[in-house]
A protein has these predicted regions:
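Alpha/beta-hydrolase-fold enzymes
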Residues: 1-55, 190, 194, 200, ...
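Low-complexity, highly charged intrinsically disordered N-terminal segments
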Residues: 31-113
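Short beta-strand/loop motif that positions the catalytic acidic residue
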Residues: 354, 360-362, 366
């Protein structure tokens, strides 16, 4: 009967869930053992050395240059029109682009015919990580953080790093923070006629936002970090354990940049059972078109992994993951600009310079960034005059695409931004 079938199915799913949970715990424990971590690090280093000797690395570099041009000129412009919130490219610096999402035309500081001032939309700059693409915040109309914030009356801009080629491998964090982001924020301030802009950083993008806010506090209205690692010594997620053990210079010597395929392999390896059974478990039950579209869109985003610029990856791993300099106020960003000879040794990123209001959003079930690492930021920003913390029952990506997040979290976050603007 149908009731018996439903009961059997329920028993099966519960058993399957239990087995997968136990298997994950076993693999997670084994993958953290010092012997395995060393083996993984040595294997990647040896593979990279072999690729360098045999010419595979050089072949990858040549192919990567072609792929970068194809992606930047054709794939990405087409991709940004599929199910996305309408947007315009308003600023471009080399491969970096600044986008502005369409909203009802309201000019800042204008007045209506009856003399009442039009309420201006506070400008917000979304800063994404170097891993994958920023469109996870605008994946589909039903689960779009961008649309959610636009509906609340915010003026949303987004930073897009583009697809780097191998000849970009020497770009540094300074290029991204003190040049690309700084010029973008100056542009936003000019076109919106405001003095300060709210920064909205997700994952590593939150770390870039922290760096910028510490170096240029006079241009930042509010600082919002989402699932952002703060105290890297507290980040005991599996990927962080592996990252600290990696001999990244071997990879960069062979491939120039950090290949996206290696990043994807690491993401899949940390949960091998779930990875191997993912599609079977999803399609074993009938699904409606909406859930299928959301699943496939998420999978597309997961594997849309551009390379990470070599020097930026080296700096981020060395300064943050291995030495934990950011939260210690000891991270130095080298000044690579041609017109600034007074800062030969660069500038120290001092989080005590962050005095503006700060909102920290944490995913309680985050297995990519330890919640304790993110939470430490509220203690580290000692001079912020207004600090808020939202802990949401979700995973890392669930913050962006979870239905409950769009009903509960983002209205609250949007309200916080408006109240502090």
């Amino acid at each position: 009967t149908i009731s018996e079938y439903n009961k059997s199915w329920k028993d099966y799913t519960e058993l399957d869930k239990t087995i997968r949970s136990r298997s994950h715990k076993v693999f997670d424990a084994k993958f953290r053992e010092e012997r395995f971590v060393k083996l993984l690090s040595d294997t990647v280093a040896n593979y990279s050395e072999l690729a360098k000797i045999t010419g595979i690395g050089k072949m990858y570099q040549l192919l990567s240059n072609r792929t970068a041009q194809w992606n930047n000129d054709f794939v990405e412009p087409f991709r940004d029109t599929l199910y996305r919130t309408p947007l315009q490219k308003v600023c471009e610096i080399e491969k970096y682009s600044l986008f502005r999402y369409d909203r009802p035309a309201i000019s800042h500081g204008d007045t209506q015919k009856d003399g009442r001032q039009i309420v201006r939309a506070p400008p917000v700059l979304v800063i994404y990580a170097f891993i994958n693409r920023h469109y996870i915040l605008d994946l589909l109309p039903e689960v779009s953080v961008i649309r959610n914030l636009l509906k609340q009356g915010l003026d949303i801009f987004a930073a897009d790093w583009g697809t780097p080629a191998v000849y970009d491998k020497t770009l540094t964090i300074d290029h991204f923070v003190n040049q690309y982001l700084d010029k973008s924020i100056d542009f936003i301030r000019k076109v919106t006629k405001v003095d300060k802009v709210t920064l909205f950083g997700y994952c590593w993008g939150g770390d870039l936002a922290l760096m910028y806010a510490a170096l240029h506090p006079e241009k930042v209205k509010n600082l919002v970090t989402i699932a952002t690692p703060g105290d890297f010594d507290l980040d005991d997620s599996l990927l962080s354990v592996w990252t600290r053990a990696m001999k990244e210079q071997y990879i960069l010597d062979a491939f120039g940049n950090m290949p996206g395929m290696l990043l994807n392999a690491a993401f899949n390896l940390r949960r091998p059972i779930e990875y191997s059974h993912k599609y079977f478990h999803f399609f074993e039950q009938p699904r409606d078109l909406e859930s299928i579209a959301e699943f496939l869109a998420t999978e597309t985003w997961l594997y849309d992994s551009p390379p990470i610029i070599g020097e930026i990856y080296r700096e981020f791993v060395e300064y943050c993951y291995k030495q934990n300099l950011l939260i210690k106020n000891k991270m130095r960003i080298e000044d690579t600009s041609d017109d600034n000879e007074s800062s030969v040794n660069g500038k120290i990123v001092n989080l005590k310079n962050i005095t503006m209001p700060f909102l920290n959003v944490i995913a309680q079930k985050d297995d990519l960034v330890a919640p304790s690492s993110s939470k430490a930021l509220n203690d580290a920003l000692t001079d912020s005059r207004d600090k808020s913390l939202i802990e949401f029952n979700s995973g890392h990506v669930g913050l962006m695409i979870g239905k409950s997040a769009h009903k509960e979290l983002w209205p609250k976050a949007g309200e916080w931004i408006k109240n502090h603007s």
